[in-house]
Amino acid sequence: MSSDQKLSTAEQALRDAANEYHRLPTRGKISVSPTKPLSNQRDLALAYSPGVAYPCLAIEKDPSLAFDYTSRGNLVAVITNGTAVLGLGDIGPLASKPVMEGKGCLFKKFAGVDVFDIELAERDPDKLIEIIAALEPTLGGINLEDIKAPECFYIEKQLSARMNIPVFHDDQHGTAIISSAALLNGLELVGKKIEEVKLAVSGAGAAAIACLDVMVGLGVKRENIFVCDSKGVIHADRTDKLDESKQRYQQHTSARTLADAVHGADVFLGCSAPGVLTADMVKTMAASPLILALANPEPEIRPEVAKAARPDCIIATGRSDYPNQVNN
């Protein structure tokens, strides 16, 4: 969704409410609060100098004690450079901060995990790796978020090998887990076998490729998967340079457009951009199609549009204001 896109009355109301929510009564959505009493001189002497020296010395002698004497064990960094924010694109690190704060809210509310959101003004993958790896003493885990493909695959792989704390790439692992669960449940509802379905995909970034890798592991046949990037179907006759992740899903096919790929498909997986799946495309899908339109905040097709075109479809989006929310 671009900032100059014409909004419906409902979207204008949502925009105004969201902006007000983020601005008042305090700016932003997260804060840092002490977990120990600070009510008198003794508390202050224990929290800082001179008492703080003793846990410092203990950790110097035995680094594992950092998990006893500091918040490290329950502290995760949500880290981005803002190059691939789902549904918004390359909006940069500063504009992505509300998304990272929002993810921090979810960690705290639903898992009790504390979060620092870290937005980095750096696009070079190797420099990002150095910066993030240097944060290891502070953190109990890393959650990579909204970093564009194919760099994100390299960054996650290098950090996982280098760091001694968990490194989770949300757009790969989180989206893959939840969308695969939706696929299994959706196919069960319509009585289709996973090894027989045709899957059309819009998007070939980190989220889409990770979803496909898991779905193939669950039984989707690779020859039944048709992936589209910004240039159309990823087919064997493409002359442009494809990264390794896209090459795995090249098809020997005459299909060239998303409309071609969607024709006769049992499942649509969208990890791309608003409005790319049209009602006319949905009409050409197989009986009881499953539509996973996961672009946020605006899906590849609105549920009401999909349902009007195909009343027999099951549609899920990444939005919380529609039924069947499927996102990471």
Placement of each model-derived feature along the sequence:
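Rossmann-fold NAD(P)-binding glycine/threonine-rich loop
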Residues: K157, G275-N327
